[in-house]
Every structure is written in structure tokens, then in C-alpha cells.
From Swiss-Prot:
Name this protein carries in UniProt: Sodium-dependent neutral amino acid transporter SLC6A17
Record organism: Homo sapiens
Main subcellular localisation: membrane
NCBIfam families noted in UniProt: Na_transp
Catalytic activity: L-proline(in) + Na(+)(in) = L-proline(out) + Na(+)(out); L-leucine(in) + Na(+)(in) = L-leucine(out) + Na(+)(out); glycine(in) + Na(+)(in) = glycine(out) + Na(+)(out); L-alanine(in) + Na(+)(in) = L-alanine(out) + Na(+)(out)
Domain of life of the organism encoding this protein: Eukaryota
Length: 727
């Protein structure tokens, strides 16, 4: 009796099999089924076709442990956006008030859709292309669109890692190279670089020394050789990590996923000990409740939830496809989502502690500069000394004393006050000066670290953390490209991965020009937002409305051993698609109301200026969006008009946990012997499907079905509910 005798008995039950077929199956004797040959008639001479019987579950690589898998998912979902985008949005949208819409949308959009992607990847054990082709062939373009979006994101994301590598190596100096403005000699006279003097040392180092940025996107300025080398190093590291496979990548994840938390914890402890850190923390948690009613806040919170978990990229599906079938992906979805949120809050605490310290430093600098102005006015008798409170000591002027003096002068000299050019030096104003995106990491943080004791050490730790966070996300992004392509087209993994990295490096040279930062902005803000939203909406529709939410819940029950909460049924069926549709509409309206643009650094002004993209850049932007979404309608149309095979000529029946994978080509509906292994018997259960999708009630024809002969989900995709059936 085979080890899976109960399954064999059930599958061989005469309830769904004709008597003659059952008799033939009863004659099977145990042999090595891997050598069996399948007779496929219908061709001249009754052609014999050898069938490869290797089990998919055994052939596919698997994680060495559950911990490796969890760390990989955390490494993919927790990225650079948690360090700079979430804190920026929190600061911009009302501090603590922003956390409320974020949490609500995380629960009704983030966790359900994250669970959905984990489940389909684990159940079907394929990358994004294979998964969506399996569920609904006409929506198979979803997987290709995911791959394209991953490619677009990977192109510029690795550039940011390259920037971090550049700063990492520059951190092994004391003092840090961005702590002071460079001095330029004009003959015998030494003067401070004008661009740096007008801005700041950290701003100058970022724009001039690191990026050597041009004044607009239209001025390419040639390649920045320093960043080109850093980009080459970044792609080399990513390529080696992906080529080694998930087992080796899993080992890397032990370090790359955990190290950032060590650094963030150290930064938080150190940050809380800084003067003014409490001011920053209080500013973060002081809610501005009026912001909660602003639709823009909800739109940005939804977008952040969407990107934070990596939905639609295919990386989540790729990683979960290497899991065991009985893995509790429901627990994984909740755990990874919570850790992602916790990381965002932890990073925000660190950012606001550092910004509170920086705000106090800048506020004190403001007080000193304005006190010097007042002293000048006193010496020139523009102001009377009677306006200065007697207890004020200019040698040790506090912020409180300055504010008292400022208010007196403003009251007495009301008519001439504006001409004095005095600044109130309010701490709140400094805290409200939001720094977005790369500026937060490469300007605000670097400036704060120049005031840290042992600043090179903290700088090395910070940029090593950014590199690790970036690499964790990049490995998942590359998995979203390589896994579905390798699964679908069976290309050699090593050659394909190396080819992808070389191609991405060459295209990535666009981002290491002097104008490269503007292209990074274009790709980051526009190339992925709309395509990813559309991808996730269609993923949700494919599972909840085409495959069927009830059927999907039943499949999850069989896979997990328990039935998921009813909550997910309503989220997948109604709430999540509706919210995503509203988000898409809002994004399109926002794009139409506000023409796309970017912040350009003007050298002569030493300041940023918002510019609109030129026509050719707009054409490129639209092309990126179209290219990312084009596979979806193209595949749908081709399969709808039968111009592209949807797999109807090959029926693939997967038997997990010891069952065979059989490919039976060109089956004739009325010849039941087409399902029987040739005269060489097999120990393994017969690959004959026994569900009524194949054998209708009272039917003697193996492929005769009631209703649509091609099934509900496309030609050749009749779903068999065997005990371990595919999704």
C-alpha cells in the first residue's frame, strides 16, 4: 500500500471514474514511477512521450528556516522609505494625527492584500507571472507588468544605494568632509566657496561634491565617475546575492535585516540624550487634528501603506513561493506588517529626535546672528539701550532672553521694525522645516551628525544601515524580476541574473549623470505609482471576483488548516478594491491638477527652485507609465481572441506531497484511456483528475463538463478540488 493510500483510494473511487477505468487502475503494481511513459494517441503511430515526473515541491528551492523567510520579507518590505518617507509624511501631515489614517488604511488595505499575495505565492509556488497566469490566463499580463515595475524601481533604487556607499567611504575621515565649507584661494586671499557660504556645508557637499548636479534636467553634464563606480559596486553586490540563491540570500538576511534595528536603537538612545531631542519628540506626537479631515493626508497615507509593504512588485509572491504548503502565511502577514509599522515609528522617533537637536542648534545660531545685528544697531544708535532688558547678557544670551528682547523692540519700534531684518528665531519654525526624500538622509542627518561626539563612527553606522536596508529591498525587487521569468521560461538562473544586473547597470548610467538626480525624482514619483495601483487592483479582482472569494477562502482553509477570519472576505471582496479605486482616481486627478515637476538646484542662487518637466521629459514619463501597464491589456486581448496560447493544449495536474506532475498533450475528450499510464504500471497514484470539473455527474467522458467546456477561468484551466489541489 503506498504511503498516501488514503488519497489514492479517494482519487480512484468509482464515484467519479468509469468502471473500466477503475478496473484498470486496480491492476497497477508498485514500481518506480519516475521511469513511466505516457501514451498519447491522436498522432500517427500513437506517439509516445516521456514525461518528467520530478515533483515541483521537491525541485523548487526552499528557505532553510522560517526565520530566514521572515527576515527576507522584512528586509524587502522595510526599506529606505521607512527611514525618510514615513517621517517626512508624518511631519508634513500633522505628526500624531497622521498615524490614525495610516493605521486605518494599513488594516483595511495593507494587511489583507499582503496576506493575499503571500497566500497565492505559497499555494501556487510560482513567481508573479506563473501565479496570475494560473488564476486567470487573460490577466496573465499582471505578472509581466510587475516585472517591468520592479525593473524601473530597481534601476533608480540601486543608485540610492550607490549614494550611500559613497557617503560610507567618505565617513572614514575626521573631521567629516561635509562639516565645513571648502576654502578657495584667490591669489593670496582665502575665501569660502560662494555656493557653500550661501547654503550650508552639508547642502554644498551633497549637491556639489557628491552629485555635482546640473541646473536642470535638460543639462546632462556627462557622467559623474565617482557615482558610476559606486553604482557598479552596488550592482555587483546585488548580483552576487541573487545568484547565490535564496539559501545564501537567507543567510545574508540575518545580518542585513537585523543590523538596521541595532543602528536605529543606538541612534534612538544617542538621540534622546541630545539637547533638544524631547522638543522633536513632542512635536512628532502633538496632533494637528484638522489635518485628519484633509483628503490629501489620507491619499498620501494610503500610498505609503501601499509602497511600505511592497505590494504589486512581485517580490512578496516570489519569496512566499519558496515556502512549504502548510506554512501559516496568515501569521506571517500580520507579523511582517506589524514589524514594518514598528520600524517606521522607530525610525520616525530617531528622525524627530535628531531634527529636534538640529532645530535647537539652528535656533541658537539664529539667536547669535540676530543678537549681533542688535549690537550693531546699538553701536550705531539705531536702537536705544533702554530697549534692552537689564538682565540680558549678550555674552550668554538664551533663547528666552532673546525672545523677550525681540518682543520689546517689535512693540516700541513697530513702524521701523521690518527694516531691522530681525528674525523671531522660533523653535517651532525650525521643526516645521520639512526635508523630503534624499534630503533627509543626505542633508539633515549628515548635518546633525557633525554635532555628534565621535561623528565619523555614527556616520559610518548610519550609512552602513542605509546600505543594508537598500540591499534587503533590492534582493526582493530582483526576485520579483528573476523568479517569474525563470519559472516561466526556464532560463538558466545564473546567466539571466548576471545579464539583468549588467543591463540594469548600463541603463542606470542615466541616473549618475550630473542631471541624474532629477531622473531619480521622475522615476520615484511617477513611474511606479499608477502602474502599481492598477496591478494591485487587478490582483484583488482576479482573486476575489474571477476566482471567487469563497473558493479562495476554502483553498486557504485546506492549506492553513483553519479558516481565516471573515474580515478578509469583506476586505477582499468590497473594501480594498473600492479604496484602491479611490486612490487611483485621486492620483490621476492630482497628476492633472498639478503638472509634474522637480526641485532643481541652481548653482548661482545656491538654492532649490521648482521647475516643470520639459516636453521630452513628460513624453518619457508617460512612456514609463504606458510601458509598465501595457502587458495587461495586450495579454488580455491576445488571449481573448486566441492569438496567444493560454495553456489549453497542455493540462497540468499538480499532486503535492508525493503526487506526480503530468503533462498530457492533445487530449481527445471521448478516449478515457488517454488518462492512463502506459503499460508500465506506477506506484504513484494515477494522474487522473477526479473532480466533477472534469467528470460531470453521470458522465462517462473524462473531460465532459457541465456548462462551459473551457471552465470559468479560461480554456484549459479547469480547477480540480483534490485534497491538495492548486489554488
Amino acid at each position: 500500500m503506498p504511503k498516501n493510500s488514503k488519497v489514492t483510494q479517494r482519487e480512484h473511487s468509482s464515484e467519479h471514474v468509469t468502471e473500466s477505468v477503475a478496473d484498470l487502475l486496480a491492476l497497477e503494481e508498485p514500481v518506480d514511477y519516475k521511469q513511466s511513459v505516457l501514451n498519447v494517441a491522436g498522432e500517427a503511430g500513437g506517439k509516445q512521450k516521456a514525461v518528467e515526473e520530478e515533483l515541483d515541491a521537491e525541485d523548487r528551492p526552499a528557505w532553510n528556516s522560517k526565520l530566514q523567510y521572515i527576515l527576507a520579507q522584512i528586509g524587502f518590505s522595510v526599506g529606505l522609505g521607512n527611514i525618510w518617507r514615513f517621517p517626512y509624511l508624518c511631519q508634513k501631515n500633522g505628526g500624531g494625527a497622521y498615524l490614525v489614517p495610516y493605521l486605518v488604511l494599513l488594516i483595511i488595505i495593507g494587511i489583507p492584500l499582503f496576506f493575499l499575495e503571500l497566500a497565492v505565492g505559497q499555494r501556487i509556488r510560482r513567481g508573479s507571472i506563473g501565479v496570475w497566469h494560473y488564476i486567470c490566463p487573460r490577466l496573465g499580463g499582471i505578472g509581466f507588468s510587475s516585472c517591468i515595475v520592479c525593473l524601473f524601481v530597481g534601476l533608480y533604487y540601486n543608485v540610492i544605494i550607490g549614494w550611500s556607499i559613497f557617503y560610507f567611504f567618505k565617513s572614514f575621515q575626521y573631521p567629516l568632509p561635509w562639516s565645513e565649507c571648502p576654502v578657495v584661494r584667490n591669489g593670496s586671499v582665502a575665501v569660502v566657496e560662494a555656493e557653500c557660504e550661501k547654503s550650508s556645508a552639508t547642502t554644498y557637499f551633497w549637491y556639489r561634491e557628491a552629485l555635482d548636479i546640473s541646473d536642470s534636467i535638460s543639462e546632462s553634464g556627462g557622467l559623474n565617475w565617482k557615482m558610476t563606480l559606486c553604482l557598479l559596486v552596488a550592482w555587483s553586490i546585488v548580483g552576487m546575492a541573487v545568484v547565490k540563491g535564496i539559501q545564501s540570500s537567507g543567510k545574508v538576511m540575518y545580518f542585513s535585516s537585523l543590523f538596521p534595528y541595532v543602528v536605529l536603537a543606538c541612534f534612538l538612545v544617542r538621540g534622546l540624550l541630545l539637547r533638544g531631542a524631547v522638543d522633536g519628540i513632542l512635536h512628532m506626537f502633538t496632533p494637528k487634528l484638522d489635518k485628519m479631515l484633509d483628503p490629501q493626508v489620507w491619499r498620501e497615507a494610503a500610498t505609503q501603506v501601499f509602497f511600505a509593504l511592497g505590494l504589486g512588485f512581485g517580490g512578496v509572491i516570489a519569496f512566499s513561493s519558496y515556502n512549504k504548503q502548510d506554512n501559516n502565511c496568515h501569521f506571517d502577514a500580520a507579523l511582517v506588517s506589524f514589524i514594518n509599522f514598528f520600524t517606521s515609528v522607530l525610525a520616525t522617533l530617531v528622525v524627530f529626535a535628531v531634527l529636534g537637536f538640529k532645530a535647537n542648534i539652528m535656533n541658537e545660531k539664529c539667536v547669535v546672528e540676530n543678537a549681533e545685528k542688535i549690537l550693531g544697531y546699538l553701536n550705531t544708535n539705531v536702537l536705544s539701550r533702554d530697549l534692552i532688558p537689564p538682565h540680558v547678557n549678550f555674552s550668554h544670551l538664551t533663547t528666552k532672553d532673546y525672545m523677550e528682547m525681540y518682543n520689546v523692540i517689535m512693540t516700541v519700534k513697530e513702524d521701523q521694525f521690518s527694516a531691522l531684518g530681525l528674525d523671531p528665531c522660533l523653535l517651532e519654525d525650525e521643526l516645521d522645516k520639512s526635508v523630503q526624500g534624499t534630503g533627509l538622509a543626505f542633508i539633515a542627518f549628515t548635518e546633525a551628525m557633525t554635532h555628534f561626539p565621535a561623528s565619523p563612527f555614527w556616520s559610518v553606522m548610519f550609512f552602513l544601515m542605509l546600505i543594508n536596508l537598500g540591499l534587503g529591498s533590492m534582493i526582493g525587487t530582483m526576485a520579483g524580476i528573476t523568479t517569474p521569468i525563470i519559472d516561466t521560461f526556464k532560463v538558466p538562473k545564473e546567466m539571466f541574473t548576471v545579464g539583468c544586473c549588467v543591463f540594469a547597470f548600463l541603463v542606470g548610467l542615466l541616473f549618475v549623470q550630473r542631471s541624474g538626480n532629477y531622473f531619480v525624482t521622475m522615476f520615484d514619483d511617477y513611474s511606479a505609482t499608477l502602474p502599481l495601483t492598477l496591478i494591485v487592483i487587478l490582483e484583488n479582482i482576479a482573486v476575489a471576483w474571477i476566482y471567487g472569494t469563497k473558493k479562495f477562502m476554502q483553498e486557504l482553509t485546506e492549506m492553513l488548516g483553519f479558516r481565516p477570519y471573515r474580515f478578509y472576505f469583506y476586505m477582499w471582496k468590497f473594501v480594498s478594491p473600492l479604496c484602491m479605486a479611490v486612490l487611483t482616481t485621486a492620483s490621476i486627478i492630482q497628476l492633472g491638477v498639478t503638472p509634474p515637476g522637480y526641485s532643481a538646484w541652481i548653482k548661482e542662487e545656491a538654492a532649490e527652485r521648482y521647475l516643470y518637466f520639459p516636453n521630452w521629459a513628460m513624453a518619457l514619463l508617460i512612456t514609463l507609465i504606458v510601458v509598465a501597464t501595457l502587458p495587461i491589456p495586450v495579454v488580455f486581448v491576445l488571449r481573448h481572441f486566441h492569438l496567444l496560447s493560454d495553456g489549453s493544449n497542455t493540462l497540468s495536474v499538480s499532486y503535492k506531497k508525493g503526487r506526480m506532475m503530468k503533462d498530457i498533450s492533445n487530449l481527445e475528450e471521448n478516449d478515457e484511456t488517454r488518462f492512463i499510464l502506459s503499460k508500465v504500471p506506477s506506484e504513484a497514484p494515477s494522474p487522473m483528475p477526479t473532480h466533477r470539473s472534469y467528470l460531470g455527474p453521470g458522465s462517462t467522458s473524462p473531460l465532459e463538463t457541465s456548462g462551459n467546456p473551457n471552465g470559468r477561468y479560461g480554456s484549459g484551466y479547469l480547477l480540480a478540488s483534490t485534497p491538495e489541489s492548486e489554488l
